[in-house]
Amino acid sequence: KELYLITYHPLTLNVKNTQKEIKTLLKKLDTLKNASLIFTKANADENGLLINEILQDYCQKNSHKAKLFDNLGSQKYLSLMKIAKAMIGNSSSGISESPFFKTPCINIGDRQKGRLRTQNIIDCEINDLDQAFEKLESKEFK
């Protein structure tokens, strides 16, 4: 199985947009064959709690391939990042830590705007996930 490490925080204060964003991400993750999905919870603001509820429900329904963690701690988190096929989401750790392991990172949205990028980062909008995963699988990217 291929491991994906996913951390997704709310991009907007709009509840409907937040729901749509996380459901779009989960729909894309459902298309991945032979995947193990490790989610870490979103931050604890209002829409972060909404994301966490949606993730909890998703992981319960897909317990054969998806697990949700409150907090993995640095050592476990970095160990998983090292062996992951990709990091997915909009967490600063995707930008700042994934390059050390040469782990590809699909960075969604503008949350990390202004941070320095390395070649392992694939920036995309939530509606461009198909193209981001195509790039992840491309020979040029590997």
Spans of model-derived segments:
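Nucleotide-activated sugar donor-binding and catalytic core shared by glycosyltransferases
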Residues: 1-142
